[in-house]
Amino acid sequence: MAVEQITNLISEQTFGIWFLIGAALVFWMQAGFAMVETGFTRAKNAGNIIMKNLMDFCIGTVVFIVIGFSLLLGEDLAGFIGKPGFDIFTAYESFDFSSFVFNLVFCATTATIVSGAMAERTKFLSYCVYSGVISALVYPIEAHWIWGGGWLAQLGFHDFAGSCCIHMVGGISAIIGAKILGPRIGKFVKDEKGKVVKVNAFPGHSIPLGALGVFILWFGWYGFNGAACTTIEDLGSVFLTTTIAPAVATVTCMIFTWIKYKKPDVSMCLNASLAGLVAITASCDVTDAKGAFVIGIVAGLLVVFGVWLLDYKLHIDDPVGAVAVHMMNGIWGTIAVGLFATSKAPGYAIAMENGAIKAEGLFFGGGFTQLGLQLLGFVTVAAWAVVCMTIVFLAIKATIGLRASKEEEIKGLDICEHGLTSAYAGFEFGAAGMPDIDITYDDVVSVGSESVENAVPAMVKTSEIPDDKKITKVEILMKQERFEALKKAMNDIGVTGMTVTQVLGCGAQKGAPEYYRGVQMEMQLLPKVQVEMVISKVPVMDVINAARKVLYTGHIGDGKIFVYDVENVVKVRTGEVGYDALQGEDD
């Protein structure tokens, strides 16, 4: 008996530690949301996105301490709400610290989902207000129904880790906010009757940053779904289903977009990974590999459909796909419990023992019992979120205003809301990006001065341009991969100086069709090399012929050669002008 007690104690302590580690992983997901939202939006708003994700958690912590936690896990009042209280201040010695931290990080996740759908045009103050309301009232009350012993929990509604009470609620808040807020300037083109006739794509400025965010979220999701597990078998099963669903969703999305758009869509596949994670969250403990596989397939298709629906039918601007990922797949994940719950999953017996589920899913012989409960929970929680967030957003719009001004949106919220010239100042040229340099009058070089130490002494020579030595500038736009061949060809004919620049551009053909999140872009800017050469000795036609010889493939995009007359040239170091300025030093 003593051995069994020791074993149980060790198990309890181990899973208690894992519970807090899981909470830390969920907190780390805030970084993932920040990276996804930043990468999928434009650079001029990157700092604003980061600031909003930071304040989600910080404001959420304050209001959750004061209001939210007791409403969520306080003494149940009629199955609807927890009894308000301040035990964290008045009874700290007996306070459930672990439960508070765990529920806090879940609460912050709900609020941060809204940020992406309303990105690039929301006033920062307004964002802080509605984020606080979500964390203080909207999330804690509906989460009490499910996790705090409320009426849905008493009925046997099952949402193990939050497909419904976190992701669906966050997604519903996002779509309501985005609808009331309106689209970004230029997203939808309307005719004189106000009908949308065209949808424009606004590509995010950093797909790698978005991908980093997805991997951070996926990693954190093992804590998100697994932290509440109390046996090693249950934990292992949750990890397995949490891996299968997003992987299958991503492959499904890749195949579908490959067929539909002729190329696999990177950003859509990143969204599909998150969609699979959202969809499996409610049933991760009570479904098996087969169920997770099917849930993932539907999630991968649903996210593509959701993005298309918002863009082309509802005309709601969602820059990061938050609605398709969280709302639609939150609904799907909630319903999926009633379809795929099985007693073969280790967590099913635990859920049944705790009254957290009533029956197996429809496809496993349980009939419509659990499916009916899941539908009831989805409808009531959705209705709560719709009513609350509609009131909140309309109230904000009528008072302090919800949307940034047109000028602020065009300039970018970084500079207008935060005084931040650029979130990437180190990569910019100009005042914002260059290091400070101390300049004294001793460093100034005067023309004609005999005391100049900075310049190499040289005789100033001037000459008339020979009649047969006209100065010409040749500019070549070409494919990057042909540059080394061009450089060798120019060297072979005696051209020894050139200026090379990496550029983006396209010709009249606008490049091949390109899609971003299912929307065809106006034109595709392709990476090119721009080579500039100023020549006098070498005949222009020799340069043109040599360039054409190495650049020609017979396909669109071989490049173009531009020829300009040059009026004069001045060599800064020596003061030489004209033809002489282009010549090297005499031996």
Identify what each model region corresponds to:
Residues 416-422, 435-587:
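Positively charged, small/polar-rich N-terminal and surface patches that mediate targeting and assembly
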Residues 2-462:
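Glycine- and aromatic-enriched membrane alpha-helices
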